[in-house]
Amino acid sequence: MCSSPSAPTAEPDVEMDVHTVSSENLPWLCIVWDDPVNLMSYVTYVFQTVLGYSRKRANELMMQVHTEGKAVVSSGEKDKVEGDVKKLHVAGLWATMQQAG
């Protein structure tokens, strides 16, 4: 008995996206909102001392809060951003967090 060569099998043309984005792996954002209480110089100072920004970057973020009403001042893992929000609250700033996306 003679065996015939097996026929080639076709591979399905499937592309797998290895960079699938789900809500679980999106970063969290710390947002500082404009308020009528804190002076611009104080907000700049808090961004420098609490978040470690340079004077120039802290001033840019403060101006964004002042002119646009809010600014994203940090991002990352949920626990880290929660910590940043708490520190900003202790300093008297209005800060919230939300997941990117």
From Swiss-Prot:
It comes from the Bacteria. InterPro entries: ClpS, ClpS_core, Ribosomal_bL12_C/ClpS-like. One of its GO terms (biological process) is proteolysis. Transmembrane segments: none annotated. Belongs to the ClpS family. HAMAP family: ClpS. Binds to the N-terminal domain of the chaperone ClpA. Involved in the modulation of the specificity of the ClpAP-mediated ATP-dependent protein degradation. This is ATP-dependent Clp protease adapter protein ClpS.
